[in-house]
Every structure is written in C-alpha cells, then in structure tokens.
A protein has these predicted regions:
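Membrane/wall-proximal cationic-aromatic binding patches
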Residues: 12-67, 121, 127-138, 143
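A generic secondary-structure signal
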Residues: 54, 85, 256-258, 297-298, ...
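Conserved, compact domain cores that house catalytic/ligand-binding motifs in diverse enzymes
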Residues: 61-69, 74, 78, 231-323, ...
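Bacterial Sec-dependent N-terminal signal peptides
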Residues: 1-15, 19, 401-408
Length: 408
C-alpha cells in the first residue's frame, strides 16, 4: 500500500531537526550563498537544460513559464514579482494567462479584471459537466448575460496590452463580441472543433478589452493570455486547497493541445501547505509516490519543459502564546526534496530562502507586515521579497550555465 511506503533516511533525519544538512543532499553552491542568493539544487545535472536552450533563442521566440500552486500564490503573489524581474532582463509585455472568473480578482494587482455570469469548474469540483478542464485546472462556462473586462495593471510597464489570446473549445455556433478601449463592438465567430482552439486579437495599444459570448450552449472557455511576440512570460495557475495531487486529473490529451499554443519551457510547482500536518511523525510516503508519478506524467505531456519544485514555505502555529514553525513543515520540506531527487528535477528550498525556522512569524510581525495574520500566507510585499529571491536564484543558475558553456 502507498501508505506503507517508507521515506528515505534523509526524510527521517529531517523529522529530528528542521535544518537538514545541505551537504548530505547535494553539492551546494557556496559562491551563491556568499552572494546572498539561496541557490537551486539540481538533482540530474541538467535539470534546466530546456529552459537554458530556450533563453538562448529568446530573441527569436518567446519563453513561457507555468507556475502551479495553491493559495500561497493566489492573486499572482510571488509570480508577479518573478515575472517583473525576469521581464526586466529578457523583455516581454504582459501578465500571461489569466482566468475568465476569479475569487481573488480584486486582490490581484498585475491586471484589473471584472466579470459576471460565469460558471466555474476546477480539479477540486465535486461535480464537473462533460467538458475538459483547462491547463490551469479551471474551465469556465458562460451563462446568459456573461461579461468579462480586462485592463492593464497599474505599473508603467503594464499600461497596455498588445496581444490578447482566448483559449476555448467550441462544439457549437458560439460567437465572441468584444470592444477595445471605447471603440465599436466587433463580432467574431469561434472556430468549431472538439479540440482546444485559440483566437488572437492584436493591437498596438489596448487599454481595456470587454468581451461577451453568444450562442454558448457548447462553448467552454479556459483562459485569456496577455503577451507579445517575444519576451518572457509567467503564468500563474493557483488553486486554493490544492495539494498538488489533483494535477493527476489533468488530461494528457488536452495538455498537449494547450502546450502546442503555449510551449512551456519551465514548469514551477509550489505545494505542501495543504498536506503538512501539525505532527512531525507522518512519513508521507504516499505523497512521494503520488507526486513522483504526477511529475513523470507531466514530463510526458510537456517534453520540452523542465521542472522546478519549490519546498513548502514556513507556517506558524500558536504554542503557549508564541508563534513557532508548525512541526510538519520541516518534514514536508524534506519530503519535497526527496520528490525532486527521485524525479531528477530542480529544487528550490523556499523555507530556507524565507529565513527558515519561525520566519513566518517574522514576516507577519514586520513593519509593515509581509504576511497575513494567519501565519500562512504572504501579502504582496512579502511575495515581492520571495519572488525576487526566486528570480535571483534562477538568474544565478542561468549566468553560471552561460559562463560554463561560453555563450552570450
């Protein structure tokens, strides 16, 4: 039985001490530590090769990153500032993939988004009609009177859209009616097919776009992407309460269709908060088995992408009036490192990058606060810190690779 699987000795040692010796696990980069960068661990020796190769040709073709996670990255937390930093280096105008409807749209700062009259289905929905789920784990069915409007975020580099891409499946006679800025409404028929399709709208200066869909009986929407012909893009695929295991429900058949349009070169996985328990005695062998299989299956669906697994963040609990790290956090961190090791993918220890033991208490108590009072979730200020740390770690590895391989 999966629950009877035993973790490796590394995981057992982590239950005794929340700071597993890095030298026991992987040859660590002391130069990065000295530079104030918490480095990425490479468990295959070439775990970011596809990503590096794509960056080498970024002047010819855009590079796209998928960032899957739970409520820790809701509202574009972390991914927003990862995107900003990497786009400053590699170019790119746009926030990437955005949902049709979102319960955290008012919280997100990287895009302004309003909507009405949509039915939403997710990997975690109790009942899903006979429709495919999108690459983000969400699908959207327009209801009577549906509308959705997008405006750029309030940052100088995000003051307009250039390209809008709508991903959908239309088995009927649906049409799109859209308005750019304050112009006249334009109507377009949506391609009829059982496959995933993309409709492209381009303009030099889109300051707002409003859409509504008609004749929608056999129409499913998956998302809207805001990007350009070149540059780097980061897509936030957050889902509240997701442990990561529900990714197994994503259909390889449809994932390959989405990837034909999006062509990911790096897929980041951030999970664990919905799995770690307050006890430190759980082995989590079942979780290792499930997640390694999921990563193996995702590799098959995204053959030209690399994978980067983030460890769980710190999480605080109240013990006798003092906020301390929850006992299960260091165990989950070691479990995730073992998942990365068995999967031969890259790993970034977000727990240590945050500051390690009791760091969430410090984030919440900072002036101004960097995290919420639940001692679990970062706010935008805290997300900016971690997003930049992750970007610095990636840029450090990219620079090291380029220096080693002697290309500009």
């Amino acid at each position: 039985m999966l629950s009877d699987l035993r973790p490796s000795p590394l995981i057992d040692s982590a239950t005794k001490n929340d700071s597993t010796s890095l030298k026991e696990i992987v040859q660590f980069d002391s130069a990065a530590i000295k530079a104030g960068i918490y480095p990425i661990e490479d468990f295959s020796g070439n775990s970011l090769e596809h990503f590096y190769a794509a960056l080498k040709k970024i002047n010819q073709k855009p590079v796209r990153i998928a960032f899957y996670g739970d409520s820790f990255i809701e509202g574009d937390i972390i991914s927003d500032f990862l995107r900003d930093t990497l786009q400053h280096v590699y170019g790119g105008e746009g926030v990437g993939f955005v949902p049709l409807a979102s319960e955290v749209s008012n919280f997100r700062k990287s895009i302004q988004h309003t909507f009405s009259n949509w039915s939403t289905y997710t990997l975690l929905s109790a009942e899903i009609p006979d429709i495919p789920l999108g690459i983000s784990g969400y699908s959207y069915v327009p209801e009577e009177g549906n509308t959705v409007t997008y405006k750029p975020g309030k940052k100088p580099v995000q003051n307009k859209f250039k390209t809008v891409k709508i991903l959908y499946q239309n088995k009927g006679t649906a049409t799109l009616n859209y308005t750019i800025n304050v112009g006249s409404e334009i109507t377009k028929s949506l391609k009829r097919s059982d496959s995933v399709n993309q409709l492209l709208i381009s303009s030099q200066a889109i300051h707002s776009i409003s859409m509504r869909f008609s004749s929608t009986d056999d129409l499913t929407l998956f998302g809207v992407s805001f990007d350009d012909t070149l540059g780097l893009y980061v897509d936030n695929f957050s889902m509240r309460s997701n442990s990561g295991i529900s990714l197994a429900k994503l259909s390889p058949y449809y994932l390959k269709q989405f990837n034909a349009y999006l062509d990911y070169k790096l897929i980041i996985l951030q999970y664990g908060l919905n799995v770690a328990l307050e006890t430190d005695s759980t082995t989590y062998g079942w979780y290792i088995a499930k997640m390694t299989k999921i990563i193996r299956d995702l590799k098959a669906s995204f053959p030209n992408a690399n994978f980067l697994l983030l460890s769980v963040s710190d999480r605080g609990i109240n013990e006798n009036g003092k906020i301390i790290t929850m006992n299960g956090i260091p165990v989950m961190r070691a479990v995730q490192r073992e998942i990365a090791r068995q999967s031969g993918i890259a790993f970034w220890d977000m727990y240590e990058a945050m500051g390690g033991k009791n760091s969430m208490s410090n984030y919440t108590g900072a002036k101004p606060p960097l995290a919420a009072k639940d001692y679990t979730h970062l706010n935008h200020k805290g997300g900016k810190i971690i997003g930049k740390k992750l970007a610095e770690a990636l840029l450090y590895e990219i620079n090291k690779h380029e220096t080693k391989n002697n290309f500009p």
